[in-house]
């Protein structure tokens, strides 16, 4: 495989071409990419089966296997997602400010592509297709570095997408898949600040910390999801249980799944036994503080580490708290700035919860599972940013662009005095510009 710097340079050159594509050209390209995934379905699924076999021999956990696995339905959903992205409004060229100043200059703020984005991720072969499509729709080149556990799947998916680029008479180097899994190659990639404009790590805590510590490129972290649901004293118990089951059991390996349940002490004796009974058919293991264990004798005693854990599994930590302030303090201490939920009938408590927490997504009487680009109306997401920069929370197409100023005038100057040049006046005799 060519040297990583050479690949990044090729991607940057290709990105300049992508940045000039019309909305219609990008739409046709993404539709062709979707068709390529459908056409190569057998090859992609065979590659994924080989990845799964290797993962099982390495005794990978069930959460990782779930993120890694593809089947015909998931692959068809990947292709449909590309078609959905193709149909989304094009952010490139959008005017976000239009102003004419008193001196007559016309000022616009216009969205343009970022340039080249590096995506470093684990498992989840669907990210290969989603990230590529989103970056290309926003006019960016994309360098993908997936995990070794999904290398065969990623190669098969990237091969299909690159074929679509060729069919559109575009350089396939607009999409680079790094196939060298060596750590030193990733380190070198993270140093290429002259060729890569943004790096997005999406995976486990260790991966994200490694990227953040070694990158010379701006990083938007998609950190772990230690998501909380706080059941306030005034909560509707049936609603709280419904949100809990949806948040914990429907996709426990998702980053927006609930990991910790906080319960107001006044409602705990009525709520917790009912919640435990509702969770029992799903096989959820409960770990609680001493107060919880008193109410639910079968619950394991939680450790401090349990409250900081992103289980990505059917495990739930529980703590009974005396009031809203205690719930907020717990979330500040153990949370990851991802997604928090309050279940309450008290509007003042809801407002306090929203105002006092600075997580990327805060829900009032709604499931944590809505913390998703599609569910929030973005159409698609490249991930959920927990870094407080221009993109915070689910990152859609707009977050893959930047705004720049375009200024049009008729010769206006800021400091230079008005001068009438005649044929006998030379530029050398012009008065000096004063500050």
Swiss-Prot record:
One of its GO terms (biological process) is L-proline biosynthetic process. Keywords: Amino-acid biosynthesis, Cytoplasm, NADP, Oxidoreductase, Proline biosynthesis. Pfam families: Aldedh. It is found in: Cytoplasm. Pathway: Amino-acid biosynthesis; L-proline biosynthesis; L-glutamate 5-semialdehyde from L-glutamate: step 2/2. It catalyses: L-glutamate 5-semialdehyde + phosphate + NADP(+) = L-glutamyl 5-phosphate + NADPH + H(+). Coiled coil: none annotated. One of its GO terms (molecular function) is glutamate-5-semialdehyde dehydrogenase activity. GO terms for cellular component: cytoplasm. InterPro entries: Ald_DH/histidinol_DH (IPR016161), Ald_DH_C (IPR016163), Ald_DH_N (IPR016162), Aldehyde_DH_dom (IPR015590), G-glutamylP_reductase_CS (IPR020593), Glu-5-SA_DH (IPR012134), GPR_dom (IPR000965). It is an enzyme of class 1 (oxidoreductase). Its EC number is 1.2.1.41. Catalyzes the NADPH-dependent reduction of L-glutamate 5-phosphate into L-glutamate 5-semialdehyde and phosphate. The product spontaneously undergoes cyclization to form 1-pyrroline-5-carboxylate. Belongs to the gamma-glutamyl phosphate reductase family. This is Gamma-glutamyl phosphate reductase. It comes from Xylella fastidiosa (strain M12). The lineage of its organism: Bacteria, Pseudomonadati, Pseudomonadota, Gammaproteobacteria, Lysobacterales. The gene is proA.
